[in-house]
């Protein structure tokens, strides 16, 4: 969350305050007990225009909490966590009450490759020439991520309501994880884009699409695109749905 900067100096929070979105779904949210860093109460106050919230943290210790957060202008009910045998990954589920309709929301942060800075630089510069350690990390993370995705996909398949699935899937659009979700869900970006790349993560001159807004709604979204913003290594993804 902007490297845990205070709200007054946090580019991510400033962007969210100005977004005028009805629903904010955040992953990798860091809040601290130490008031020199961003605290949970400070985050709530900075986004107090949203009366309904859901905080779902995976990592707890005496100083830091880390996980997902949802801020909404619509009521959130039936909140629960989908946990994995992973120290830093989580999926959060809740139902959004939009007028007389109910939408089931899945906010996700799936397994990453956990590359060091030098490893990431190497992969982005030479994606087809990686060393043994990098290959092992890719294989291990891909397997873990697909297991996580199967757990979420099972919940999606049994949802009694239309589904909105968002977040950092750490998966390319040709990956098994992405294709598993596409068995049941539409990709809002593909439905509304016109030859745009849609990169949501950038390192140097290379960008990739690993963050998504997937859904089982009708009608289709009127817009879905990454938004240029600072403060994070991921670009925020914004979509508009009209009932």
Give a label for each model feature.
Residues 4-8, 21, 35, 63, ...:
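Extracytoplasmic/periplasmic, Sec-exported soluble proteins
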Residues 135-161:
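A long, amphipathic alpha-helix that forms part
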Residues 151-164, 169-243:
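Metal-dependent phosphoester-hydrolase catalytic domains
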